Amino acid sequence: MNRAPVFLLVEPSPIVASAYGRWLENAFSNSQCLVASNGAEALQLATDNIPSYVLIELSLPDKAGIEILIQLRQALPASRIIATSWFQGRWLIDGVRSAGADGFVSKDKLPKELLSLWKIFIE
């Protein structure tokens, strides 16, 4: 029996994090959403809870999102990690993939594209 999906949302805005959390809990029944507002919290929650899925905003208040992404990938080798940002460009997508992300979704494409990715990963 598979365990319920555990998501880690790394998002500095409490309003955005709350909206994402509600959206994920509605889209995936029995899921659990952990929320970190900065890189240090993200790393602590990741090591304490081993989430299966991570959504990380690349603009964080304490450290560069790419740096946290690299550390999350090292701590969570089996987890699926998606990076997100308002910034876009091939350079950014290539950078997050090199850092260990499984994908990138621009914030202006959320939640539709993100939902499609999570469904692929979960199924």
Where are these regions (language model features)?
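The feature encodes the CheY-like receiver
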Residues: 61
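Short amphipathic alpha-helix used as the core "switch/output" element in two-component signaling
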Residues: 66-77
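Alpha4 helix (beta4-alpha4-beta5 surface) of REC/receiver domains from two-component response regulators
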Residues: 67, 87-105, 109
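Two-component/phosphorelay signaling modules centered on CheY-like receiver
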Residues: 14-34
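Acidic, metal-coordinating helix/loop segments flanking the phosphotransfer/catalytic sites
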Residues: 35-53
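Conserved acidic carboxylate
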Residues: 11
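Acidic catalytic/metal-coordinating carboxylates
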Residues: 38, 64-67
